[in-house]
Amino acid sequence: MAKKSKIAKNEQRRAIVERYAERRAELKEIIRSPASSPEQRVAAQSELNRQPRDASAVRLRNRDAVDGRPRGYLRKFGLSRVRVRELVHDGSLPGVRKASW
């Protein structure tokens, strides 16, 4: 089980990323666009730098939905490998079977 504070911090970051996502995308488009002038690029870059660090999506951590485990995360299920294994053995994940060949 992950620390409650780490799980809460990650959720707080997720909210901040969501709040700033649209504006960040606009600024990045201005920076990348060959049609924008150098002054516009500098202004967009400085505004992007003024935003909070936690507004960047790369600072998010994928965590197990059940207990918040940060490692061994499987995107398909939103769970860690340990939790997936437990649920598969219990038969709680429909359509998933142990591999055999």
Swiss-Prot record:
Gene3D superfamilies: 1.10.287.1480. InterPro entries: Ribosomal_uS14, Ribosomal_uS14_bac/plastid. Pfam families: Ribosomal_S14. Transmembrane segments: none annotated. One of its GO terms (molecular function) is rRNA binding. Residues 31-59 are annotated as: Disordered. Keywords: Ribonucleoprotein, Ribosomal protein, RNA-binding, rRNA-binding. One of its GO terms (cellular component) is small ribosomal subunit. GO terms for biological process: translation. Binds 16S rRNA, required for the assembly of 30S particles and may also be responsible for determining the conformation of the 16S rRNA at the A site. Belongs to the universal ribosomal protein uS14 family. Part of the 30S ribosomal subunit. Contacts proteins S3 and S10. This is Small ribosomal subunit protein uS14A. It comes from Mycobacteroides abscessus (strain ATCC 19977 / DSM 44196 / CCUG 20993 / CIP 104536 / JCM 13569 / NCTC 13031 / TMC 1543 / L948) (Mycobacterium abscessus). The gene is rpsN.
